[in-house]
Amino acid sequence: MNSSKLYQNTTISTCDDAFQESIDSKAAKTTAYAVIMLISLMGNSAIVLVVFKLQRLQTSTNLFIANMAMSDLLMPLFAMPRMMTMIHFGANRWLIGGNFGLAMCKLAPLFQDVSTAVSIQSLALVAADRFYNVFYPVKAQVMNLRVVKVAIALVWSIAFVVHSPYLYIYRIYLQEGKDYCLLSWSPPFANNMQAQKIYFILLFALLIALPLCTISALYTAVVIRLKRQQCPRLHQSDKARKMREKHNRAILQLAIVIVIVFVLCWTPFTTFVFLKFFVWGKTQCRQSHTAFAVQFIAHSISAINPCVYAIFSSSYRRGLKEVLTCCASQRCVPTKSCRISPVAVDENLEMQTVRCS
């Protein structure tokens, strides 16, 4: 979902006068972005901190979710400041000059869209992990951490490779004494719009359609399998069976909700871009507020995901409380001085206590 490549065609300031928007409107939009930026920075940082501080939370699923949180951190660092600049200075305005400015003109959209690509691929990894855990529970218990690390590295590599053209197509142009960060496929492609259409379709098929179809198929199989497992098994005690089913359903619920949120947040923007490319041809001034709305909804997913994780994952809430409690005591650091002792075990949903010294 290369939102930044299409930025110059679907941004909020498609009118000739970038400042014709009222001050109140600009202030409201800036405030909205500031809010989700703060939530995204704090929420995703908390997920990464808790997962990597508490060893018991370093399961394959949680590591994939932490990886998604790391990618979501790129949104408030690159996408949102860029959007706030456009709100006040106009579409594609670039305020940083020199070689550093040129480098950031290329890297900002690159990191922005790498973030989305890593997120959707991480969701696919979570789905594959859930499928593996439900269908092959014995093998899943001995899954090597190296496999998880390789999968995460592969996800980031794919995201950077497919978006590597950004390093070529994004350039700074001087227009009427002002710098603009714009994309251009020429050379070697003379028809810039046609090149954008082809690239967008390829990215949509590879990074959106294929992962979502895979995720849907895997979760459908998992749901069917879990329903069949509701029948008691002779080789499992009733308590053990119920514990495993509860654990699988809790993680499945979290994973499915995150996927639904992703689809709901990105569908409006994707639809808008399709209409822009294949129906309208050019975004009209009267569509500027709609363009802003769909971009804001898409960017807000980086703030929504941490909230979803906090709501649906009791183990994460406990872990966050433990880390915050330990750090607030000012007598220990979670990685060294916090000794975490299990007091009850329920599959991977352990209850644990923290002692600070």
Residue ranges and their predicted role:
Residues 74, 85-91, 115-125, 132, ...:
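Fourth transmembrane helix
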